[in-house]
Amino acid sequence: MKYEDIRRQVLTAIRQASAQGLIHGTSGNISVRDREAGVAAITPSGRPYDTMEPGDIAIVTLEGEWVDGPYAPSSEPPMHTAVYRARPDVGAVVHNHALFCTVMAMAVDELPPSTPPQAEFAPIRVVPFAVPGSRALAASVAAALGTDGLAVLLRNHGSLCCGAAAYVEEAAQVAYYASALGRFTPLGEADIRACKEMLAAGRAV
């Protein structure tokens, strides 16, 4: 089987995301890049994740062209591959419709971190709604991530992460509940920088 390693990585990641409650049914999509081959493995469209096999995972070029696999890729290769083209450092992309990210994407223009582990993802910007799978959505996501961003929220849609998606959903959940209680206190800029430095040095926060 061609591209077996990245296909298996995608399958493992999508099952973990499903177990964490970040993905339901066949919603959401995950991709992993093969830098040497210049392709990415991405979840296929409409296939149940619990019965999926590595060979079911679609392969696309970094321009989004489907080149291998028995099932068509998710509708979102333009968004995934736009991130890969803009960010050579990114090796995997997770897009989901997790509840709290989706809710907060409709309520705020930026989601600030409120705990040390969330600092790694700051700032988490919110991009305007665009039709899923469109070039407009792909372009706005790549622009919002910039040169070092790790996550964005998609208004009326969900989120996209280049890292541990569970922390982004946690950030949205904490912000939602704290706001509901009447006082949401995010980390300050100096604290965010300090936490990022600790994380970059491999120190747990």
What are these regions (language model features)?
Residues M1-V205:
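Glycine-rich flexible loops
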